[in-house]
Design a protein with these regions (language model features):
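Bacterial N-terminal signal peptides that target proteins for export
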Residues: 2-14
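Serine-dependent carboxylesterase/thioesterase catalytic core
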Residues: 112, 116-191, 195-196, 391-395, ...
Length: 673
């Protein structure tokens, strides 16, 4: 028994000894399967698949795998830095695709660790302090971002497969984002260097350290766009709240930026720069139009070379600045790629900084800081091949009235390719006739400046969109007055003899006109063609007496309103003349305008609001304008929407406006392509 027991113990000891000996083998390292499985949710799967240094703060799975293949996941690449990047560059065991995409992300990781100067911004997104000097980390930071751009560029266009062959791969989207971000950051760095006088070399060449940037020729921007930006803002850094409902972009290649210019109109509430004040004095009196002072742009860095080695050693990239409204695709090394664009950022930033809402009320009541003449804003640089879509706001309003209208229209590719949006900003305290006359003169100046021969597409088939009082002005632009307005006012208005004489001498040129030949279609939105009841009520008359006309107006044609006396509207000098009085249904002017014949060559449409869905349509109103005043019996179309007076912002109204514009394009044999 003792022998048997000893044999059992010996055999057991032998088995454990063998198992311990075999413990180093992979198959017997543990008591269980060598591969285990666990379930993940779809969200976790997508996060693992698409997460990278930008979205999660950690390297992507693709880069981690490449580091493992190269044997760099431990040791030199245990923490981010230049040694890891140099080791990856020296690796000979990974494909170029994997190497370049991983190096782009590793350089990005390194760039994000470098300190950046902190700047404080106001609620409107404006930097509180200007860049006056560059920090000590400027050059290393620029070098890192340029390396990101170059490695990403090499991956996209100079590795084993073309960009089209990788079209549906998540990795290509990641690397494209690295390139776009790197170009964005490098562009801002370049602008800061320019602003501080650090840039050296000729105007078309900028040298910063090892890099020489070659400025590519412009792709046709107008002369207005040659202004120097006072600020360069990445569109991706902006977040908008308030009434703006959406941000519209086009995915693609390039950095989306907003170039903030000084506003020559001086309409913004914030103080203009010294340069703007100097130019404003010389331009405001003569130039009543300008481009929107915050145009969007897309920037590319193009690295030269016939092969991968040449691209990776190109320290003289070409800097291309594109207008995304003009250019939708670019050719890079024989491949057509879409150009990235942000169609909302520049427009929204302009409105956010303008303080138009307060200024329009100051203007109406004659407060300090208002405006006294109309100004035409072009939402993009003038394009001779795009027709004009001109928007005119209403009483006590401003371009802010069109924030969602313009934004939603410009998301439509066909409308964006066919039209360029212009908006009038005008003092709504002025008599309607004077605003209309000033706008006509402005349009004449603009077309004469850009198209003296009148042959450009932009000079023909304009579409007008007018809201409320802006619709009345739009109607005047397509009407023939003859002597009707002057005769009617002389016959019906309660005027003194002095007022009548002033009307004949100074008023007649303003009240006599023909249809604007450029206009072929008009959309009237909540327009009081025959005035309103509200303007004639006690409250309306009281508000009307608070309206203050600019002194320059009082000294000119508006003296008609005050018996030749430069006096505020106090109700003691006969016929009152201001915008609110003009909208009274019993006002001789608005009644005369309603009888003017509109051009038979012009198509017109009505978008009308009713505050309540119940009741007969003929007895409804939008809170201010009754249906009987906004209805036109011979309109091409009429759309009635349950809404308040600001119906232009309602989604059904924008949808109807898009329908009308597409109908217009079809009528002109245009598809927007």
């Amino acid at each position: 028994m003792a022998t048997t027991g000893l044999g059992f113990i010996g055999r057991t000891t032998l088995i454990f000894t063998v198992l311990l000996t075999l413990g180093g083998c992979a198959t017997l390292r543990q008591f269980g399967p060598s591969v285990q499985v666990a379930s993940v949710t779809p969200g976790q799967y997508i996060a693992l698949k698409r997460g990278d240094i930008l979205t999660s703060g950690k390297l992507s799975a693709a880069t981690i795998e490449t580091l493992r293949v190269a044997g760099l996941d431990e040791g030199v690449c245990a923490k981010p830095g230049l040694p890891c990047i140099e080791a990856m560059e020296s690796s000979i065991v990974v494909r170029e695709e994997d190497k370049r995409s991983s190096l782009a992300e590793l350089w990005l990781q390194y760039a994000m660790t470098l300190p950046a100067p902190k700047r404080e911004y106001s609620a409107s997104g404006r930097a509180k302090t200007a860049v006056t000097e560059l920090d000590a980390d400027f050059q290393p930071r620029l070098d890192a971002w340029m390396q990101v751009a170059r490695q990403a560029y090499a991956y996209l266009f100079f590795t084993e497969r073309t960009a089209n062959q990788r079209g549906f791969e998540d990795r290509q989207t990641q690397v494209r984002d690295y390139y776009n971000l790197a170009v964005q950051e490098a562009s801002v760095q370049l602008y800061n260097a320019y602003a501080t006088g650090r840039v050296h070399g000729q105007a078309s060449h900028f040298q910063l350290g090892r890099w020489t940037f070659v400025l590519a020729p412009s792709d046709g921007a107008s002369a207005l766009d040659q202004r120097t930006p006072s600020e360069l803002v990445p569109a991706a850094s902006l977040s908008f709240t308030g009434t703006l409902r959406s941000v519209h972009r086009r995915d693609g290649f390039g950095a989306e930026l907003v170039a903030v210019m000084d506003d020559p109109a001086g309409s913004t509430a914030t103080a203009p720069s010294a340069a703007a004040q100097a130019t404003q004095a010389s331009t405001s009196a003569t130039q009543s139009w300008s481009e929107m002072p915050s145009p969007s742009m897309t920037v590319l860095l193009r690295f030269s070379g016939k092969n991968l080695w040449e691209v990776l050693h190109d320290d003289e990239p070409e800097l291309e600045i594109h207008d995304p409204y003009q250019v939708s695709e670019v050719t890079l090394h024989g491949q057509q790629v879409p150009l990235a664009a942000n169609f909302t950022a520049g427009y929204a930033l302009w409105l956010a900084r303008s303080n138009f809402s307060r200024q329009s009320l100051r203007t109406l009541f004659g407060g300090k800081g208002g405006i006294d003449t109309p100004h035409l804003y072009m939402m993009q640089p003038y394009d001779p091949n795009r027709r004009v879509l001109l928007m005119i706001h209403g009483l006590a309003s401003s371009p802010e009235a069109w924030v969602n209208v313009a934004n939603e229209l410009l998301r439509d590719d066909e409308i964006r390719r066919e039209f360029q949006v212009w908006q009038f900003y005008y003092p709504t305290n002025m008599p309607i006739a004077m605003s209309h006359d000033a706008m006509r003169h402005t349009l004449t100046e603009v077309f004469k400046h850009f198209d003296p021969s009148g042959k450009a597409q932009a000079s023909h088939d304009m579409v007008l969109v007018g809201h409320s009082m802006g619709g009345v002005i739009a109607r005047l632009m397509i009407s023939s007055s003859g002597d009707h307005l002057v005769d009617t006012l002389l016959a019906t208005a309660q005027m003194t003899p002095a007022q009548r004489e002033l009307l004949r001498t100074k008023g007649a040129p303003v009240l006599t006109f023909l249809p604007e030949p450029e206009v072929s279609r008009v959309v009237f939105i909540a327009t009081p063609h025959r005035g309103t009841d509200v303007a004639g009520t006690r409250l309306g008359r009281w508000i009307g007496r608070l309206v203050r006309l600019p002194l320059t107006v009082l000294e000119d044609v508006a003296t008609i309103a005050n018996d030749g006396q430069i006096d505020r509207n106090d109700g003691k000098h006969g016929y009152q003349m201001n915008s609110i009085q003009n909208l009274d249904k019993d006002d001789p002017f608005v009644r005369a305008v309603a009888d003017l014949p509109m051009s038979p060559k012009v198509h017109y449409h009505s978008i009308i609001a009713r505050a309540k869905a119940d009741g007969p349509l003929e007895k409804t109103d939008d809170g201010l304008v009754p249906y009987w005043s906004s209805h036109l019996p011979h309109a091409d179309s009429e759309k009635v929407i349950v809404s308040g007076h600001s119906v232009q912002e309602a989604t059904p109204a924008i949808v109807e406006l898009r329908r009308i514009l597409h109908e217009d394009m079809q009528a002109h044999g245009r598809t927007g392509k």
